[in-house]
UniProtKB/Swiss-Prot annotation:
[4Fe-4S] cluster 1 binds at residues 377, 380, 383, 426. Keywords: 4Fe-4S, Cell inner membrane, Cell membrane, Electron transport, Iron, Iron-sulfur, Membrane, Metal-binding, Repeat, Translocase, Transport. It is a peripheral membrane protein. This is Ion-translocating oxidoreductase complex subunit C.
Length: 747
C-alpha cells in the first residue's frame, strides 16, 4: 500500500489557483528549425544585462576585440559582458536599451571585422574533478544569467542554494502563447541540455531532478525522453497547458505541491529552478569554454514573412533581426519584445538584444487589436479570480494610483509576477500590469534613496566617531606631554621652583608683599612707613652736613671733588705733610715779633694757583718728583739762612707769592700708596733737618723756607663718604693751624 501511494505521489502533479487559457499561436514559429543570421553592421552591448549593478569597463575606444573577450569586469553580483564577435570598439556611449521606460544606458559599440575569431577559450571538460568554487567562478566569469526572463546571476543563485536543496526543477513549460525559443532548443539540443543538468546536479547534489514541460510541445517531449534514456535520477513531468504555468512559484506548486511563502524564494522550501536555456548555456561554458554571447530568439507575428527561431548574438539591433524575418517597416510599426501578455512595446527598433530577450513579436493590424480606452474599475473581481499569485489586483491598483506605497507593499505587491492575467480579463481595459510596474519602480527608488541616506548617515556617524577618537587621542598626547617629562626636565623644574621659593623667602624678609583681597581696600601702611623712614634719613644727613659746614672755617683754597678714593688718599697725604711743615715753622718763628710778621703776611696777598688733577699716573709721578726737589731746596735754604732775623724772614715769606702746583692723582691704588709713602719719608727728613738747624736764626730760616712757592692742592668735594671723611680731616687740620696761630699772636 505504501509503495502504491509513493508511486502515485511520484507521478502526480498539482494545480494552482487562477490562470487563463489564451489562444495559442506557437505554430507560427515552432515548425521552423533554428538558423544562423548574418552579422549586423554594428553591435550595441549594454553593460547591464542582468539583475544587479553594471560592471567596470576594461576596454577603450579603438581597441581590437575577439569573440568571447570580456568587455567589463565582473565582481560579486556584477556579471561581465563579452564581445559577440571580433572587431573594433567604435564608441562607448549612452544608448536606448530594451526596457519599458525607453531610457538610455551606457553601452559599448563594436564594429565587426567579419572574421568572427574566438579568443582563448578555457574549458572544464573534467568538471567532476574540479571544486565547487572553481565551477561557480567559471560560470560567473562566463556571464551566465537566467535566460527565462529574470536575468538573475546563475552562479549567485547556485551559491545560495548549496545547502538544503532537495529538488532541482528544470523549467521547460514556456507558457507564453507566441514564444517557442525553448521549444525549438529542446527539440534540437536535448542532449546538451541534459549535460547542463548533470553539471547542475553535480553542484547542488539534489535528491531528485524534475523536468517540467507543457503538453503542447510533443516534439520537445519526445526529444527529451530520447536524451534521458533509462536515467532514473531525472524525471520528465508533462503538465497541462495553462498560463502562467511557467512561473517559478506556479511550476513549483504543480510539480511538488508546495507553495512558496510570501516574500520568499523557492529555495526556502528546498526547491531550486533553472531554465532549459540556462542549462544549455552552462554546458557551453563548462564543456566548450564559450561565454554567453548568443541565445535563441523567436521571431513571430503575422507581420513577418519568415517567422521562426534564430541564433541571435547579444547586442544585435532589433531592426536587423526583423529584417532577417522579412519584416516591412511601416510608418508607425508595433513591435513587442517578449510575449503579448508579459512583453512590452519597444520605443525604437534600434534597441539591442540582451540576455533576457527571448521573443520579438511583430503583429499585424488584425492580429492584435489596438489598445482600447481605459474605463473605470467596476470591481467585478475577475482580476482576483485570474491572479495565479492569490493577490488582490484591484486593491493594488488603487494603492498604485493613490501613491500609497506602504499599503501596496503590505499587500504583497512584489509577489506579483506581472503575468498580465488580470489585465487580460479586465472588462474595463485597465493596464494593471503597467500600474504595478510603475509602483514597483517608485518603491525601489524610495528604498534606494533611503538606503543611500542610511549609508550617508553611517558614513557621517563614522566620521564623527573618528573625529572624537582623534580629539581624544590629541588630548591624551597633550596630557602625556605635560606629565611625561624626563629626569633632567624634572631636575630643571625642581631647581626653578627652588629659586622661586628662595626669592619669595627673601622678599618676605625684606618686605612682605601686600595681600590684595577681592573686596577689601588696599593696605599701603608698609609702603608709607618705608617712605617716611627714607625721608627722615635724608633729613638727618642734611642736618649733619649743615652742622659740619658751620663748624669748619672758610678755606681760601677752593676745593674740588675727588672722583676716586685713590685721589682722596693722595690729598690726605699731602695735607698731613703740610700740617707737619706748618707746625715746624710755627715752632721756629716763636721768638719773632708778632706785629712785623702779621703785617708782612697780610701786606701781600697770597697767590693761590688752582691745581688740576693729573690725567694719568705719569703726571702724578712728575708732580711727586717736583715736590721732592722743592723739599731739598727748602732744607738747604733753612740751613744757610739760620742767622737771618725773624722780621726779614717774615717779609720774605709774604713778599713772594706762593706758587701752587696743580697735581693729579694717580689712577692706580698702588701708585697712590707709593706717593703716600714718599710723602711720609719727606716729612721725616724735614723733621730731622729742623732739629739739626735749631740754633740757626729764625728769621733767615723762615725767609728761606717761604721764599719758594708752596704747592697748594685744590681739593674737590668728594662724591662718596670716604671723600667726605678726607675733606673733614683737612678741615680739622686747618682749624688746628688757625688755633695755634691765634695763640702765638696773643703771646
Amino acid at each position: 500500500m505504501l509503495k502504491l501511494f509513493s508511486a502515485f505521489k511520484k507521478d502526480r502533479i498539482w494545480d494552482f489557483d487562477g490562470g487563463i487559457h489564451p489562444p495559442e499561436m506557437k505554430t507560427q514559429s515552432s515548425r521552423t528549425p533554428l538558423r544562423q543570421i548574418p552579422l549586423p553592421e554594428q553591435f550595441i552591448i549594454p553593460l547591464k544585462q542582468h539583475l544587479g549593478p553594471e560592471g567596470e569597463i576594461c576596454v577603450s575606444v579603438g581597441d581590437k576585440v575577439l569573440r568571447g573577450q570580456p568587455l567589463t569586469r565582473g565582481r560579486g553580483r556584477t556579471l561581465p559582458v563579452h564581445a559577440p564577435t571580433s572587431g573594433t570598439v567604435n564608441a562607448i556611449r549612452q544608448h536606448t536599451t530594451a526596457h519599458p521606460s525607453g531610457l538610455s544606458e551606457l553601452s559599448i559599440i563594436i564594429v565587426p571585422d567579419g572574421e568572427d575569431r574566438w579568443s582563448d577559450r578555457q574549458t572544464l571538460a573534467d568538471y567532476q574533478t574540479q571544486s565547487t568554487d572553481t565551477l561557480l567562478a567559471h560560470l560567473h566569469q562566463a556571464g551566465i544569467a537566467g535566460l527565462g526572463g529574470a536575468g538573475f546571476p546563475t552562479a549567485a543563485k547556485l551559491q545560495g542554494g548549496m545547502r538544503g536543496i532537495e529538488t532541482l526543477i528544470i523549467n521547460g513549460a514556456e507558457c507564453e502563447p507566441y514564444i517557442t525559443a525553448d521549444d525549438r532548443l529542446m527539440q534540437e539540443c536535448a542532449d546538451e541540455i541534459i549535460q547542463g543538468v548533470e553539471i547542475l546536479s553535480f553542484l547542488l547534489q539534489p535528491k531528485r531532478i524534475l523536468i517540467g514541460i507543457e503538453d503542447n510541445k510533443p516534439e520537445a517531449i519526445s526529444a527529451l525522453r530520447l536524451a534521458l534514456g533509462k536515467r532514473s535520477d531525472m524525471q520528465l513531468r508533462v503538465i497541462p497547458t495553462k498560463y502562467p504555468s511557467g512561473g517559478a512559484k506556479q511550476l513549483t506548486k504543480i510539480l511538488t505541491g508546495k507553495e512558496v511563502p510570501f516574500g520568499k524564494h523557492s529555495a526556502a522550501i528546498g526547491v531550486l529552478m533553472q531554465n532549459v536555456g540556462t542549462a544549455f548555456a552552462i554546458k557551453r561554458a563548462v564543456i566548450d569554454g564559450e561565454p554567453l554571447t548568443e541565445r535563441v530568439v523567436t521571431l513571430t507575428g503575422e507581420a513577418l514573412r519568415q517567422p521562426g527561431n534564430v541564433w541571435a548574438r547579444l547586442g544585435t539591433p532589433v531592426r536587423h533581426l526583423l529584417k532577417q524575418g522579412g519584416f516591412h517597416v511601416n510608418k508607425q510599426p508595433m513591435v513587442v519584445m517578449g510575449g503579448p501578455l508579459m512583453g512590452f512595446t519597444l520605443p525604437s527598433l534600434d534597441v539591442p538584444i540582451v540576455k533576457i530577450s527571448n521573443c520579438l513579436l511583430a503583429p499585424s493590424h488584425t492580429e492584435m487589436e489596438p489598445v482600447a480606452e481605459e474605463q473605470s474599475c467596476i470591481r467585478c473581481s475577475q482580476c482576483a479570480d485570474a491572479c495565479p499569485a492569490g493577490l488582490l489586483p484591484q486593491q493594488l491598483y488603487w494603492f498604485s494610483r493613490g501613491q500609497e506605497h506602504e499599503k501596496a507593499r503590505n499587500h504583497h505587491l512584489f509577489d506579483c509576477i506581472e503575468c498580465g492575467a488580470c489585465a487580460y480579463v479586465c472588462p474595463s481595459n485597465i493596464p494593471l500590469v503597467q500600474y504595478y510596474r510603475q509602483e514597483k519602480a517608485e518603491i525601489r527608488a524610495i528604498d534606494e534613496d533611503a538606503q543611500r541616506a542610511a549609508q550617508a548617515k553611517v558614513r557621517f556617524d563614522a566620521k564623527q566617531a573618528r573625529l572624537e577618537r582623534e580629539k581624544a587621542a590629541r588630548e591624551l598626547r597633550h596630557k602625556q606631554a605635560a606629565t611625561g617629562v624626563s629626569t633632567s626636565d624634572k631636575d630643571a623644574v625642581q631647581a626653578a621652583l627652588e629659586r622661586v621659593r628662595r626669592k619669595q623667602s627673601t622678599t618676605t624678609e625684606i618686605g612682605a608683599p601686600i595681600a590684595v583681597m577681592p573686596d577689601a581696600q588696599p593696605d599701603n601702611s608698609a609702603a608709607i612707613a618705608a617712605r617716611a623712614a627714607r625721608k627722615a634719613l635724608v633729613r638727618e644727613e642734611r642736618a649733619r652736613e649743615n652742622q659740619t659746614q658751620q663748624e669748619t672755617p672758610t678755606v681760601d683754597v677752593p676745593s674740588t671733588e675727588l672722583d676716586d678714593p685713590r685721589k682722596a688718599a693722595v690729598a690726605a697725604a699731602l695735607a698731613r705733610v703740610k700740617a707737619r711743615k706748618a707746625a715746624q715753622q710755627t715752632a721756629t718763628n716763636a721768638e719773632a715779633p708778632v706785629s712785623s710778621v702779621t703785617s708782612d703776611v697780610v701786606a701781600e696777598p697770597v697767590a693761590v694757583v688752582e691745581t688740576q688733577e693729573p690725567d694719568d699716573p705719569r703726571k702724578a709721578a712728575v708732580a711727586a718728583a717736583i715736590a721732592r726737589v722743592k723739599a731739598r731746596k727748602a732744607a738747604q735754604q733753612t740751613a744757610t739762612n739760620a742767622e737771618a732775623p725773624v722780621s726779614s724772614v717774615t717779609s720774605d715769606v709774604v713778599a713772594e707769592p706762593v706758587a701752587v702746583v696743580e697735581t693729579q692723582e694717580p689712577d692706580d691704588p698702588r701708585k697712590a700708596a707709593v706717593a703716600a709713602a714718599i710723602a711720609r719719608v719727606k716729612a721725616r727728613k724735614a723733621a730731622q733737618q729742623t732739629a739739626t738747624n735749631a740754633e740757626a736764626p729764625v728769621s733767615s730760616v723762615a725767609s728761606d723756607i717761604v721764599a719758594e712757592p708752596v704747592a697748594v692742592v685744590e681739593t674737590q668735594e668728594p662724591e662718596d663718604p670716604r671723600k667726605a671723611a678726607v675733606a673733614a680731616a683737612i678741615a680739622r687740620v686747618k682749624a688746628r693751624k688757625a688755633a695755634q696761630a691765634s695763640s702765638h699772636q696773643e703771646e
